[in-house]
Amino acid sequence: MSRISDAFQKRKSLIAYITVGYPDIETTLRLVPLLEENGVDIIELGIPFSDPLADGVTIQNASYQALQNGVTPEVCLSVAALLKEKISIPMVFMGYYNPIYNYGLTKFCQKCATAGVSGFIIPDLPPGEAQDIDFAAREAGLDIIFLLAPTSTDERIKLVAAKSRGFIYLVSHSGVTGATANLPADLSSFVNRVRKTARQPLAVGFGISTPEQAQNIAKFSDGIIVGSRILQLVQTDPSLEKVATFIRQLRQSLD
């Protein structure tokens, strides 16, 4: 069992996404330990990219600002190495394939392992085209986590169930990331459809923005993923007190 899958064993897993270097590196280094202290089980560290196709306006803007701050994959690895000394929960990189490919797949995976990163998610890389990075990840002892959407075919579900390690990322709705008031009414049937095939923990993301939503989704999933709402609160309250309160509320709703 990996560190990532182990984070689902004792309770519903609360997974938090942040963009590395938004609004600056100093905030990232303060924010991640605060997330752990208030109940987060897994940290997703977003590698900023100039064309984040799967992301809504909040994460797009965060990525743009981080890129303006000079945040590269190398900087993200350095930040992870610093965070490794501050936290005990697993870290996962979330990033698009192009910057990782340009960095070098084997080199990236080896440096992830050295920096204390336990795995990664690449939203624009289909599992059927991931052989090279999957091999490099296995060699480095890393999990590679794939995504499924409500529109995924049974064939795709079987493929992801065979390939994904750590957990499977279930996208709550078609489209892009972003906090939303309403989630699909048939979300539970999608999760249950995947569960018939997959043995990995199932975590739901895209659009979760309230403790009530988190509590409802946790009834039929193994964990929830929150990102855009955290970044919005970071933007409005640099003290991070609102983020801490929000995470505590999410934790309470899951327990």
Curated annotation (Swiss-Prot):
Pfam families reported for this sequence: Trp_syntA (PF00290)
Reaction(s) this enzyme catalyzes, per UniProt: (1S,2R)-1-C-(indol-3-yl)glycerol 3-phosphate + L-serine = D-glyceraldehyde 3-phosphate + L-tryptophan + H2O
Classification via InterPro entries: Aldolase_TIM, RibuloseP-bd_barrel, Trp_synthase_alpha_AS, Trp_synthase_suA
EC class: lyase
Cross-referenced PROSITE patterns: TRP_SYNTHASE_ALPHA
EC number: 4.2.1.20
GO CC annotations, alphabetized: cytosol
GO molecular function, one term: tryptophan synthase activity
Active site annotation, chain numbering: E44, D55
Keywords of this entry: Amino-acid biosynthesis, Aromatic amino acid biosynthesis, Lyase, Tryptophan biosynthesis
Pathway assigned to this chain's UniProt record: Amino-acid biosynthesis; L-tryptophan biosynthesis; L-tryptophan from chorismate: step 5/5
Stated role: The alpha subunit is responsible for the aldol cleavage of indoleglycerol phosphate to indole and glyceraldehyde 3-phosphate.
UniProt record similarity statement: Belongs to the TrpA family.
Complex and partners: Tetramer of two alpha and two beta chains.
PANTHER family in alphabetical order: TRYPTOPHAN SYNTHASE ALPHA CHAIN, CHLOROPLASTIC, TRYPTOPHAN SYNTHASE, ALPHA CHAIN
This protein's name: Tryptophan synthase alpha chain
